[in-house]
């Protein structure tokens, strides 16, 4: 919000603030002698130069630009190189119709040179571009928000060449005052003499004819007098890194004047003197020529080395923008190497897409699906992403929250647009239809195209491996992106009772005749759900069951409703599951429910604080009972996930919704429990203990946690003793627990208890 307010403030000021140029005796304080001018030449510029004073309002606007508009000081270099690139593009375009404009020899080389003068704290940036006349210096540099590039684009708006021009606002130049307290701009146009423009950003600027004459031939040199707190930008390694970060794909070569220490060959060394025997330590001295002389002694031998500092122009952007080439001209090895340079790994991408879009907006892009997910894939607060945005080959940002959905943060690649408008600082993207087009037409469409191609390959290994690593992200996409939910859902994979991995479409193809539901179960792992009693009847009847074992699956399925608008998703962990039954099976179920009605009522009454109801199960085949949730309740897997999230958030949510118990009337244990209830009635202690044990074990097998493990253990102990001896011959004490029913505490006669367990008499009760 602050950034938006800032932009509107600046744009508002642009709307009504104009620079008025009034002659003034005030002169910008600039040390011209540190730029190579003699004292006399500097004095001549001061005396003969035309001096202008910024109006008060414009001076305030300058302060806003310098202190508020840009968030990073390093941006200045990107802006100045971009301006230099614009100037080179202009002269190249003009030379298409008049080749003489380029000149001859070195002057015809279109390039950018950067030179560091540490002695004077000056950074020079020189281009052989179109240059500026005196009037253009006043108009382009003396007037804020008056961009020469913008005006030039108007002149050549009918030509495609203009799309290479970077500048869109006239404030990028002033970013130099982030690191410099004053600046000297020397410029030579083919249409005028060479002029010098100087300013300290505080009050005024001066324009004068250069007393040195035409030293540039053509082009512009910007000399920044670096502030004391910004001297890191006089370090050649820092400059190299910034050029590589922001401008390595500029169309024109960028050279830096670098220094390095080299060893002087022995045959070129002069005045070599052997060291004496008493010199046993290494010594280093500097020669008058700036050479270093290193001498050592080893086993009485004399070894002498000399080094010297040499200077040379080093090209910093020899990497060409791969995405600007036609896909047919790029080798697989080049794609792989480019991916590695972007991802900073030695991995090989799973697949990639190199494309160009045309129409209302034009984009060039290379998108990669990486071999491995980034470590911060689900860290929504992490800065940056694997995708980098360029505008006319200039790096803008990798913070692309406006363009890249959270679930696609793993993508690696570049997007370059000639049409994308930026705000005045080029750091924040304006919300508009072009951004929306990039998001929908470039990123989403191409990603879906890539996974479609992978999934349709006869060898499913590559797609299956991709999905194991990035499937959770795709599921998140199906949840968040309603517009593309159906398209993404087609490519989701799940393990099942019949396949290692299957799509929903594959499941539907294998459906039984008359089946109109997709049966699934959620859980912690494939092994755990394969062993769940909830799938017994489905498997027995020949139905395939999907195993949804990714935590995000719990949130995905409710968003899907139906697959292909036809097949409903049915969670076997919820009540109301239905299988196709004939009339005979339905009648048998009704008869069974009537037969077991006493037990159903008894269990509901005894466990009323825990159960919503007790019903005859349709999902069990081999197990005696199970707990399920109702249609709106919390399943066992949901409870597990929610508890884990609550633990991370240091909170304790309540999971007190009542469950539904389903019993299997064909299981011997359930039959015996019904018989005992009918024989001994509801007050029988063994029946009560059995009911509680049945509930707790049903909860465990369903995946729910036990509220009170101690009480559960007491029930187990008591049941063991009931089966081992009669209640009358066993010394224990029964206590009531108002929440969990009866529990058992043993007496103090341990010896008698041990004897009873060693030689138990015949029980008079039915063993459960």
From Swiss-Prot:
**Which cysteines form disulfides?**
none
- Tree of life domain: Eukaryota
Q: Motif Prevents secretion from ER residues?
A: 765-768
Q: Where is the signal peptide?
A: 1-28
User: What InterPro entries has UniProt attached to this entry?
Assistant: HATPase_C_sf, HSP90_C, Hsp90_fam, Hsp90_N, Ribosomal_Su5_D2-typ_SF
Q: Which GO terms describe its molecular function?
A: ATP binding; ATP hydrolysis activity; ATP-dependent protein folding chaperone; unfolded protein binding
For this protein, the record's CDD domains field holds: HATPase_Hsp90-like (cd16927)
Sorted keywords for this record are: ATP-binding, Calcium, Chaperone, Endoplasmic reticulum, Glycoprotein, Golgi apparatus, Nucleotide-binding, Phosphoprotein, Signal
Q: Name one Pfam family in it.
A: HATPase_c_3
- Which residues does this entry assign to the site Important for ATP hydrolysis? 426
Q: Name one GO cellular component term.
A: endoplasmic reticulum
Where is this gene product found? Endoplasmic reticulum; Golgi apparatus
**The record's account of how the chain is modified after translation:** Phosphorylated.
Q: Where is the composition biased (Acidic residues)?
A: 288-301
Q: Which GO terms describe its biological process?
A: ERAD pathway; protein folding
Record's compositionally biased regions (Polar residues): 733-743
Q: Which residues are glycosylated?
A: 83, 317, 423
Cross-referenced PROSITE patterns, in alphabetical order? ER_TARGET
Q: What induces it?
A: Expression is greatly reduced following starvation.
| Similarity field | Belongs to the heat shock protein 90 family.
| Record's protein name | Endoplasmin homolog
Annotated source species? Dictyostelium discoideum (Social amoeba)
Instruction: Give the gene that encodes this protein.
Output: grp94
């Amino acid at each position: 919000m602050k950034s938006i307010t800032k932009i509107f403030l600046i744009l508002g000021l642009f709307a009504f603030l104009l620079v008025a140029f009034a002659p003034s005796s005030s002169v910008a304080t600039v040390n011209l002698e540190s730029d190579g001018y003699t004292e006399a030449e500097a004095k001549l510029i001061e005396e003969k130069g035309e001096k202008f004073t910024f109006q008060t309002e414009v001076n305030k606007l300058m302060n806003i630009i310098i202190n508020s508009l840009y968030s990073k000081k390093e941006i200045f270099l990107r802006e100045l190189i971009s301006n230099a690139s614009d100037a080179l593009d202009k002269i190249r375009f003009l030379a298409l119709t008049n080749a003489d404009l380029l000149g001859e020899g070195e002057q015809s080389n279109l390039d950018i040179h950067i030179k560091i003068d540490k002695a004077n704290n000056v950074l020079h940036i020189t281009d052989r571009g179109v240059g500026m006349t005196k009037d253009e210096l006043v108009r382009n540099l003396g007037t804020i928000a008056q961009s020469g590039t913008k005006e030039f684009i108007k002149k050549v708006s009918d030509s495609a060449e203009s799309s290479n021009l970077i500048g869109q606002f006239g404030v990028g130049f002033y970013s130099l005052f982030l690191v410099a307290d004053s600046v000297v701009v020397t410029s030579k146009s083919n249409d005028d003499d060479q002029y010098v423009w100087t300013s300290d950003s505080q009050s005024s600027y001066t324009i004068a004819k250069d007393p040195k004459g035409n030293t540039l031939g053509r082009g512009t040199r910007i000399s920044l007098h670096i502030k004391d707190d910004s001297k890191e930008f006089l370090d050649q390694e820092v400059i190299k890194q910034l050029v590589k970060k922001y401008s390595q794909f500029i169309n024109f070569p960028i050279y830096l004047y670098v220094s390095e220490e080299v060893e002087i060959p022995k045959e070129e060394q002069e005045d070599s003197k052997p060291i004496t025997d008493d010199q046993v330590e290494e010594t280093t001295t500097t020669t008058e020529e700036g050479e270093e002389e290193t001498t050592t002694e080893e086993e009485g031998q004399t070894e002498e080395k000399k080094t010297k500092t040499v200077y040379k122009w080093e090209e910093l952007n020899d990497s060409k923008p791969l995405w600007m080439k036609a896909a047919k001209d790029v080798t697989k090895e080049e794609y792989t190497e480019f991916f590695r340079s972007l991802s900073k790994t030695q991995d090989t991408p799973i697949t990639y897409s190199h494309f160009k879009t045309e129409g209302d907006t034009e984009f060039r892009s290379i998108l990669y699906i990486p071999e491995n997910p980034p470590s911060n894939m689900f860290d929504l607060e992490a800065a940056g992403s694997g995708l980098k945005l360029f505008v006319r080959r200039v790096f803008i940002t990798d913070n692309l929250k406006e363009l890249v959905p959270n679930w696609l943060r793993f993508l690696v690649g570049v997007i370059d647009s000639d049409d994308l408008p930026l705000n005045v600082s080029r750091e924040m993207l304006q919300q508009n239809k072009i951004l929306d087009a990039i998001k929908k037409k470039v990123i989403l469409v191409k990603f879906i195209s890539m996974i479609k191609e992978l999934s349709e390959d006869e060898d499913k290994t590559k797609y299956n491996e991709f999905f194991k690593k990035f499937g959770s992200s795709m599921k998140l996409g199906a949840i968040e992106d309603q517009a593309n939910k159906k398209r993404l859902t087609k490519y989701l994979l799940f393990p099942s009772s019949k396949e290692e991995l299957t799509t929903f479409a594959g499941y539907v193809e294998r459906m039984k005749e008359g089946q109109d539901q997709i049966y699934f179960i959620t859980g912690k792992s494939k092994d755990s759900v394969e062993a769940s009693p909830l799938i017994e009847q489905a498997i027995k009847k020949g139905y395939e069951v999907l195993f949804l074992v990714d935590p995000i699956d719990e949130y995905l399925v409710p968003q899907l409703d139906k697959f292909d608008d036809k097949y409903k998703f049915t969670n076997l962990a919820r009540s109301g599951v239905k299988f196709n039954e004939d009339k005979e099976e339905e009648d048998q179920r009704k008869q069974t429910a009537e037969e077991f009605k006493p037990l159903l009522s008894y269990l509901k009454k005894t466990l009323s604080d825990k159960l919503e109801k007790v019903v005859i199960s349709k999902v069990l085949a081999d197990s005696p009972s199970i707990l399920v949730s109702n249609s709106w309740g919390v399943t066992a897997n949901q409870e597990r996930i929610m508890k884990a999230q609550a633990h991370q958030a240091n909170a304790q949510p309540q999971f007190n919704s009542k469950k539904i118990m389903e019993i299997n009337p064909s299981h011997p244990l359930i039959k015996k429990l019904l018989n005992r209830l009918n024989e001994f009635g509801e007050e029988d202690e063994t029946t009560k203990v059995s009911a509680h044990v049945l509930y707790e074990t049903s909860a465990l097998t369903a995946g729910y946690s036990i509220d009170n493990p101690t009480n559960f253990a007491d029930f187990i102990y008591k049941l063991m003793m009931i089966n081992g001896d009669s209640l009358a011959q066993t010394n224990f004490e029964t206590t009531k627990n108002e929440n969990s029913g009866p529990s058992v505490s043993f007496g103090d006669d341990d010896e008698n208890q041990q004897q009873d367990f060693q030689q138990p008499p015949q029980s008079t009760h039915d063993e459960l």
